[in-house]
């Protein structure tokens, strides 16, 4: 998204030329904007809220209250998938399983752990692996992991590819679980993964996003 926005600005705003660089994601982007390392960056609003308030993973860093939001791009949604043969249906079924939660300090990890928080799932009772969205989905397909998460616009590429080769199950949430997540972070909204987003997904699945 950042590269696309930069290209639009460069092509359409007189006197503006943007240079882009890669990063590890929302957490780094918030810090880099705050310190002046970069002028503008893309970050999910849940991470921005934590950065501004000095909460969550920013508790040890402190408030980055010089951050300002200038616009929104698209809705990012938490999407967790497993193989249909696993018999797993809900995110809370992952207790004690092997799960890809996204890269370390990523928006995917942040959102996945937010979901797990109200379910009693953490690294003490479940194997949580920091893998990219594509690698996580591939590991599910290869039988190495039981489930993988992504926090991005739908459909998520790695999960889409998995659904093209394997029968998958999109992991659902209960309304009570959704309510717990929303109560813990004002940036989140309730949404759904509509039926048909992935091959073989016959029903809407409850989730949250930003």
Place the predicted regions along the sequence by residue.
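Bilobed "Venus flytrap"/periplasmic-binding protein-like clamshell domains
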Residues: 1-20, 76-142
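Pocket-flanking alpha-helical
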Residues: 3-7, 19-61, 80, 88, ...
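Structural recognition of the beta-strand scaffold that forms the well-ordered cores
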Residues: 19-20, 39-43, 69, 79-81, ...
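Residue-level preference for short coil/turn positions at secondary-structure junctions
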Residues: 34-36, 76, 95, 210
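Short Pro/Gly-enriched coil loops immediately N-terminal to beta-strands
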Residues: 63, 70-77, 163-164, 174
């Amino acid at each position: 998204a950042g590269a696309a926005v930069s290209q639009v600005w460069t092509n359409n705003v007189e006197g503006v030329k943007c240079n882009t660089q890669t990063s590890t994601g929302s957490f780094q982007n918030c810090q880099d904007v705050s310190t002046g390392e970069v002028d503008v960056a893309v970050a999910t609003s849940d991470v921005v809220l934590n950065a501004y308030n000095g909460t969550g993973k920013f508790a040890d860093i402190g408030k980055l209250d010089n951050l300002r939001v200038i616009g929104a791009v698209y809705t990012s949604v938490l999407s967790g998938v497993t193989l249909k043969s696993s018999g797993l249906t809900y995110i809370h079924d992952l207790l004690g399983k092997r799960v890809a939660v996204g890269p370390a300090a990523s928006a995917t990890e942040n959102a996945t752990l937010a979901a797990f928080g109200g379910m009693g799932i953490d690294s003490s009772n479940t194997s949580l692996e920091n893998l990219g969205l594509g690698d996580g989905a591939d590991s599910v397909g290869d039988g190495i992991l039981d489930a993988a998460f992504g926090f991005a616009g739908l459909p998520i590429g790695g999960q889409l590819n998995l659904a093209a080769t394997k029968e998958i199950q999109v992991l659902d949430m209960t309304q009570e679980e959704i309510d717990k997540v929303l109560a813990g972070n004002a940036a989140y909204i309730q949404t759904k993964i509509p039926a048909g987003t992935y091959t073989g997904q016959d029903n809407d699945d409850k989730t949250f996003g930003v």
